Amino acid sequence: MVDFKTYDNKEFSLESNEGNVGILLSGGLDSLLLLTLLCEYFDRQRYIIFTIDKPDGSMMWTEKILDYISDRFPTNEFYQQIIEGGDTDEKAELGISGKVGFSDVLRNYYSNLGILYSGNTANPPVALDHNTAEPDRSAALKAQEKWEKFTMPF
């Protein structure tokens, strides 16, 4: 386990796993940072990268991220799974409501993972002028409570 402290004194930790390490890679900065930190501190891991195909086009960045990470950390293994379903809402039998793609990861891949990371971040402590609405993290927070191996370190 590696412990970190941010510039504003928030603490988080990351841990390796003997099994597969799952990561929800959106193509954004948060999940890129998470994957980079994991690879920097934990060598010779097998990473299962889950990218949910959403209509916002963010998936195009995940290929570039994986090319960069694979070159920089060649002793790790990377396997990408493109998950269909995008932003469609679903109330699944999993006990949480959320997006179809995320439900698919929990339903079909979770049991083969030692840990599943998400780069979701907490909402900003202050409202920003350009935001139209606060991001809704409730489904991910409920999943973190319900699914023992699912974690959002940020």
Give the positions of each predicted feature.
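ATP-dependent adenylation/nucleotidyltransferase module used to activate substrates
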Residues: 1-154
